[in-house]
Amino acid sequence: MLDIVLYQPEIPPNTGNIIRLCANTGYRLHLIEPLGFEWDDKRVKRAGLDYHEFAEVKRWPNFEAFLEAVAPTRVFACTTKGRTAHSAVQFAAGDALLFGPESRGLPIEIIESLPFEQRLRIPMLPQSRSMNLANAVAVFVYESWRQLGYAGSLQE
């Protein structure tokens, strides 16, 4: 499976929804601190319902600690600043999908540290700025999982 990495997420219900998404797909969730909310915020739990126990969630003090411990094969910056469509890449087990905080996106230093082909975006109309974080994560997760044949799902 792949790893979902939320860099300094700010909105508890988004993180809760992503926890539920990970529980349903088997993807692992990594949260890069500082979080913009308390981990025990009831809005995180409410959005994730009773799926928290079925999701693998880890917190990291910084992005470097995540990279060192997990050592993903490739890291993809999922950003409005990307040039490659999310569906134009062949994902593989061991990849990590990195998303920035809701209000400001990923730091430019992180984006620029990755090769151009690993800076991905979801196609949108020109007048649109961005998508909701939980929705964007779901788009990436289901595209990558589709490419992997929905490994581990009930459809197998």
From Swiss-Prot:
Gene Ontology BP annotations: wobble position cytosine ribose methylation; wobble position uridine ribose methylation
Gene3D superfamilies: 3.40.1280.10
The UniProt record lists the keyword Plastid: no
Gene Ontology terms, MF aspect: RNA binding; tRNA (5-carboxymethylaminomethyluridine(34)-2'-O)-methyltransferase activity; tRNA (cytidine(34)-2'-O)-methyltransferase activity
Enzyme Commission no: 2.1.1.207
Keyword terms: Cytoplasm, Methyltransferase, S-adenosyl-L-methionine, Transferase, tRNA processing
One GO CC term on file: cytoplasm
Keyword Transport attached: no
Intracellular or extracellular location(s): Cytoplasm
Subunit structure: Homodimer.
Protein name (database record): tRNA (cytidine(34)-2'-O)-methyltransferase
Species: Aeromonas hydrophila subsp. hydrophila (strain ATCC 7966 / DSM 30187 / BCRC 13018 / CCUG 14551 / JCM 1027 / KCTC 2358 / NCIMB 9240 / NCTC 8049)
